[in-house]
C-alpha cells in the first residue's frame, strides 16, 4: 500500500468509481499451468454459492464492535466454518488501533546484511500480529531502491535484487512461522512513476527477482501495485501476473490488489484473486452496483491535501508535492462489477472459482479451515520485543567515517556535548505512515541512555531545535473562550486563560470530552513562528485568521486513536502527538480557533497550543554552539524525511558546521530514511548512519558511541556525492524520474540500477554499496571457486580480524560479466551474487563459504524470451563492499 494515499478507504472508492466508467476490455493472457486445489477445497467450492465465494475474494467492512482499525478485512463464510480474515499494514511493525512495537526502518534492517536478523524481524512482526488479532501482514516491501524522489523509496530493502530477495525470503519465513500470512508488495516495478516502461530483461532480473525469492520461501500472498507496467495496470496485467509470476516463477498463493488498484472486473481473469478494499460504489468484485456513499467534503479533501503536502517547520521551505489522489484509469469498456461481467461473458464462474480456490488453499495451508485464527487481543512481549529491536537497530547502524574518535572513552564522557532534538528523544518512527506508531513511553534519547549507563555528570544536552516549544502564555491571548462538552452533556462556554490542559499542567480533560477555543492570538513581532498543536486522547484542528493550519488524527483509515508518533517527526517531550507548523505572522492580533474531539481510546483528553518564537529559535541555536565549544567532544544528531531530496531540512547543516568550527572532535549521528548530502563531511571526525531506529534508538546510540556494540552495518544503497549522479536523477535522463511530468518512468538504464549504474558510468560514489566501517579491521585471503551440486558456485575464502576487538564482517561475492558476453544482453561489470555476516574474534581467522545459486548465473534473453545459463568465462570478486574487492578468480567452466 502507498504512503501518499492514506485516505484510500474513502477517497479511493470514489476515485475508482470514476475509473470504472472509463474502462476498456482487458485481453486475457495465455492460461499458465495451475495446480488444482485440494479435494477439500474443491468440495468447499462445490458447496459455496456465488455470493459466498465473493466473500473470500473481496474486502469488506468488519463490524464496528469487533474491528481493530486494520487495513482490510474479508468476511468469510460462517455456514461452512470459513473464518473472516484481518489484514494489517506495514512495514515496519503492525498498524492497528492498539499500541505495538516500533521497529527499525527497512533500510536499517537491510543494512544488517543478515538473514538471521531478517528472520528475527519477521518473527517479531508475526508475533505482534497474532497478539493483535491480525491474520495477514502487508509486508515485506520488496521493491527496488531506484529513485530517491519516489515517495516510498525509504521503505525498500535497498537497491540490489539479491540483497532484497534474500532478506525478504527470511522475513517471510519468520513471520509465517509465527502463524500469520505474509503478503509481499508491490508487484511489480513499483519503483517510480505511474507507468514503468521497462524491458523484459530488467523486469525479470531486477524488479521481479525478489518476488521469485519470496515465492520460493512460500509467501502466502502478493500484492499487485497501483502502477502500470508498459502501459497495462499491474493488477490487470496478465503478462506479469499469469505470465511471469505464476508461469515463470511458479507462485502458488493468491494475489491481492493494493487498495483501489483494481480498475475492472475482468482483472480476475488476468491473475488478480482478491480486491481490496472491496467496498463502496467503486468495488469491481461485487455482483452488482454497491450503494452510493456520501462524497468527501471539501474540508476532508483540504485535510488530505494538507496532510500529504505540509511538512514540519524545518521542511516547509522546500517545494512539496501536490497530492492529486490515485491515478484514474482511462480505459473505457471494462465491466463495472462482476455481475455485469458475468452477464457479458467476459468473466465466468470458473474464474471466480479459481480465485476463491487460491485463497482457500492458503487458508487450508495455515489451518484456518479447521479452526478460526484467534482475533483476541492479548499481551505482547514488550520487554522481549524491545531487546530484539535494539539488537537489530545496533546491527543495522552503518559507521561511515571514523578518524579514531569512536568509541568514546570514559574520559571523553566527562565532557561530552549531545546536540539536537535527537539527543533528547530518539527518532524512532519519523514518517508516521503505514507502520506501527511504536511505544512512545520507551523512546528515550541517547542523553538519557548514556546518563543511565555511565552515571557521568559531564554529559551536556542542547537541543538546538526545540520541537516541543513552550505553551503559548496567557498574555498572548485576548478574548479567549472555551466551549467544553462532556460525554452526554450540553456544551458549557466560558472564558479561558490559555490552551494548556495536560497532565503536566494538572488540567487535563476527562475522557470523552470535546472542546473548542475561539479568541485572538497576540503576536509580539513580525516573523516565522512555529505553532504546535499537541494532543492525546483526542483528534484536533486549528485555524489562524480563518486558514486551516494543522490537524491530527483526522483520517480514520486506521482508526481515530491519536498516538504520540502519529503526526510528527518526534512527539513532545511529555509524550503528546505534536503537529508543528511554520506560520509567517505579523505583529498584532490574529483570530484563532482550536478544536479537540475525543477519540475512541477512552484516555483523558490532553490539549496544548505551544509555540517557538523567532528569538527562542535563535537562542537555542546559539546555546547549542556554546555548549559544544565548552566540551571535549560533541555529538550532533541530525534527521531527514527526504524533504528536501538528498539533504537535511532546516538549519541542520549550518548547525553541524557551526559546532565543528568550535569543537574539532565532532561526531554526527544521522537518523535519515535515505542518503543525504554532507557538505560538512571533511569537518567532522565521525559519522554514524542509524536510519530510523524504532523504540530503542536511545540505547542503540549509547551502546555504539561507547563501544558496547561494534558497528557492522553495511550500506544497502549507493551514497552518491551528488544527487545528479543517480540513475533516475541524472539531468541527462529526465525521462527516468518518477516525478517527470508525463507520469511515465522510462527504465532506459536496463539492469544498471544502483551500484551497477555507478560502475557502468565509472562514477565515484561518496560511499559505495556494501560499505561500512567497524571498530576493527579485516583482511581477506585464499579464494577458491568450485562448481556446486545444484549447478551454482561455492566461493571459499578466509577472513582475518586484524584488530584487538571482536567484530562482524559482511562478506560479499560479486560475479562479473561472461567473457565473451552474448551480443545484445546487458551484464553488470560486477553484480552481488552472495553475502553473509560473520562474527570473528579479535586476532583470529575464519574460513567462509558463500553459495551462488544457479539462477544468479543466468540471464534473460530479449531475443528469444528465454533464460540462459552463463557460468563460463566469469570472474568472481570477494571483499567488503562493491568497490573493495581484494580477491578475484576466474571460473572457466
Where are these regions (language model features)?
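Bacterial N-terminal signal peptides
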Residues: 13-24
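Bacterial N-terminal signal peptides that target proteins for export
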Residues: 2-15
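Sec/Tat signal peptide C-region and signal peptidase I cleavage site
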Residues: 25-29
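Glycoside hydrolase catalytic-domain context in secreted enzymes
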Residues: 30-860, 866-883
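Short beta-strand elements
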Residues: 884-893
Amino acid at each position: 500500500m502507498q504512503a501518499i494515499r492514506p485516505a484510500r478507504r474513502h477517497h479511493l472508492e470514489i476515485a475508482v468509481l470514476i475509473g470504472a466508467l472509463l474502462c476498456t476490455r482487458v485481453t486475457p493472457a495465455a492460461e499458465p499451468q495451475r495446480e488444482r486445489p485440494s479435494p477439500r477445497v474443491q468440495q468447499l467450492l462445490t458447496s459455496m454459492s456465488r455470493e459466498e465465494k465473493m466473500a473470500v475474494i473481496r474486502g469488506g467492512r468488519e463490524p464496528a464492535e469487533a474491528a481493530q482499525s486494520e487495513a482490510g478485512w474479508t468476511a468469510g463464510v460462517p455456514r461452512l466454518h470459513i473464518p473472516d480474515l484481518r489484514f494489517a499494514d506495514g512495514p515496519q511493525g503492525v498498524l492497528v488501533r492498539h499500541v505495538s512495537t516500533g521497529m527499525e526502518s527497512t533500510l536499517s534492517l537491510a543494512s544488517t546484511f543478515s538473514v538471521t536478523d531478517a528472520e528475527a524481524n519477521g518473527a517479531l512482526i508475526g508475533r505482534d500480529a497474532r497478539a493483535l488479532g491480525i491474520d495477514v501482514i502487508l509486508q515485506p516491501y520488496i521493491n527496488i531502491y531506484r529513485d530517491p524522489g519516489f515517495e516510498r523509496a525509504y521503505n525498500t530493502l535497498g537497491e540490489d535484487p539479491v540483497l532484497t530477495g534474500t532478506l525478504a525470503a527470511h522475513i517471510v519465513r519468520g513471520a509465517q512461522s509465527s502463524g500469520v500470512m505474509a503478503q509481499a508488495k508491490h508487484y511489480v516495478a513499483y519503483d517510480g512513476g505511474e507507468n514503468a516502461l521497462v524491458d523484459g530483461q530488467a523486469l525479470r532480473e531486477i524488479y521481479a527477482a525478489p518476488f521469485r525469492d519470496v515465492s520460493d520461501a512460500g509467501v502466502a500472498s502478493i500484492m499487485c501495485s497501483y502502477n502500470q507496467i508498459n502501459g497495462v495496470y499491474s493488477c490487470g496485467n496478465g503478462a506479469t501476473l499469469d505470465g511471469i509470476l505464476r508461469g515463470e516463477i511458479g507462485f502458488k498463493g493468491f494475489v491481492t490488489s493494493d487498495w483501489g488498484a483494481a480498475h475492472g472486473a475482468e482483472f480476475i481473469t488476468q491473475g488478480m484473486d482478491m480486491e481490496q478494499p472491496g467496498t463502496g460504489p467503486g468495488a469491481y468484485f461485487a455482483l452488482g452496483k454497491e450503494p452510493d456513499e456520501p462524497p468527501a467534503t471539501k474540508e476532508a479533501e483540504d485535510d488530505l491535501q494538507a496532510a500529504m503536502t505540509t511538512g514540519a517547520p524545518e521542511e516547509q521551505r522546500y517545494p512539496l508535492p501536490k497530492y492529486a489522489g490515485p491515478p484514474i484509469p482511462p480505459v473505457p469498456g471494462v465491466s463495472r462489477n462482476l455481475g455485469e461481467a458475468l452477464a457479458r461473458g467476459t468473466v465466468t464462474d470458473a474464474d471466480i472459482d479459481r480465485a476463491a480456490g487460491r485463497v482457500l488453499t492458503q487458508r487450508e495451508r495455515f489451518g484456518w479451515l479447521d479452526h478460526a485464527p484467534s482475533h483476541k487481543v492479548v499481551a505482547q512481549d514488550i520487554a522481549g520485543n524491545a531487546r530484539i529491536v535494539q539488537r537489530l537497530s545496533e546491527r543495522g547502524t552503518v559507521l561511515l567515517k571514523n578518524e579514531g574518535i569512536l568509541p568514546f572513552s570514559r574520559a571523553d564522557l566527562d565532557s561530552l556535548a549531545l546536540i539536537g532534538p535527537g539527543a533528547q528523544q530518539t527518532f524512532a518512527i519519523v514518517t508516521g505512515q503505514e507502520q506501527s506508531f511504536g511505544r512512545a513511553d520507551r523512546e528515550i534519547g541517547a542523553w538519557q541512555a548514556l546518563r543511565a549507563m555511565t552515571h557521568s555528570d559531564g554529559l551536556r544536552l542542547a537541543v538546538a531545535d526545540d520541537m516541543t516549544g513552550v505553551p503559548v502564555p496567557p498574555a498572548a491571548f485576548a478574548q479567549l473562550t472555551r466551549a467544553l462538552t462532556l460525554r452526554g452533556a450540553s456544551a458549557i462556554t466560558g472564558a479561558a486563560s490559555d490552551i494548556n490542559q495536560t497532565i503536566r499542567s494538572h488540567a487535563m480533560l476527562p475522557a470523552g470530552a470535546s472542546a473548542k477555543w475561539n479568541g485572538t492570538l497576540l503576536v509580539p513581532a513580525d516573523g516565522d513562528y512555529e505553532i504546535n498543536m499537541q494532543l492525546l486522547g483526542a483528534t484536533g484542528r486549528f485555524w489562524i485568521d480563518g486558514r486551516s493550519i494543522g490537524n491530527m488524527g483526522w483520517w480514520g483509515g486506521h482508526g481515530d486513536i491519536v498516538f504520540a508518533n502519529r503526526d510528527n517527526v518526534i512527539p513532545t517531550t511529555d509524550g503528546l502527538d505534536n503537529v508543528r507548523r511554520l506560520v509567517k505572522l505579523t505583529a498584532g492580533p490574529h483570530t484563532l480557533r482550536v478544536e479537540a474531539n475525543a477519540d475512541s481510546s477512552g484516555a483523558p483528553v490532553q490539549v496544548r497550543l505551544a509555540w517557538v518564537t523567532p528569538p527562542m529559535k535563535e537562542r537555542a541555536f546559539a546555546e547549542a554552539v556554546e555548549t559544544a565549544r565548552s566540551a571535549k567532544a560533541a555529538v550532533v544528531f541530525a534527521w531527514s524525511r527526504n524533504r528536501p531530496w538528498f539533504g537535511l531540512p532546516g538549519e541542520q547543516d549550518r548547525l553541524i558546521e557551526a559546532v565543528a568550527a568550535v569543537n574539532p572532535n565532532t561526531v554526527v549521528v544521522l537518523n535519515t530514511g535515505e542518503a543525504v548530502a554532507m557538505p560538512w563531511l571533511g569537518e567532522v571526525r565521525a559519522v554514524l548512519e542509524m536510519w530510523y531506529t524504532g523504540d530503542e534508538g536511545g540505547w542503540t546510540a549509547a551502546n555504539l558511541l561507547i563501544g558496547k556494540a561494534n558497528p557492522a552495518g553495511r550500506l544497502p544503497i549507493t551514497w552518491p556525492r551528488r544527487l545528479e549522479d543517480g540513475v533516475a536523477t541524472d539531468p541527462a535522463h529526465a525521462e527516468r524520474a518518477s516525478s517527470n511530468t508525463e507520469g511515465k518512468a522510462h527504465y532506459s538504464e536496463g539492469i544498471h540500477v544502483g551500484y551497477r549504474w555507478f560502475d557502468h558510468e565509472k562514477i565515484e560514489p561518496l560511499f559505495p554499496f556494501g560499505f561500512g566501517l567497524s571498530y576493527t579491521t579485516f583482511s581477506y585471503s585464499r579464494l577458491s571457486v568450485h562448481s556446486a551440486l545444484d549447478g551454482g558456485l561455492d566461493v571459499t575464502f578466509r577472513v582475518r580480524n586484524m584488530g584487538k576487538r571482536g567484530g562482524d564482517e559482511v562478506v560479499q561475492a560479486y560475479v562479473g560479466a561472461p567473457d565473451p558476453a552474448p551480443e545484445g544482453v546487458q551484464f553488470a561489470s560486477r553484480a552481488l551474487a552472495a553475502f553473509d555476516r560473520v562474527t570473528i574474534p579479535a586476532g583470529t581467522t575464519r574460513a567462509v563459504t558463500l553459495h551462488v545459486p544457479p539462477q544468479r548465473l543466468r540471464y534473460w534473453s530479449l531475443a528469444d524470451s528465454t533464460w540462459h545459463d552463463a557460468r563460463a568465462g566469469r570472474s568472481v570478486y570477494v571483499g567488503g563492499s562493491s568497490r573493495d574487492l581484494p580477491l578475484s578468480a576466474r571460473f572457466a567452466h
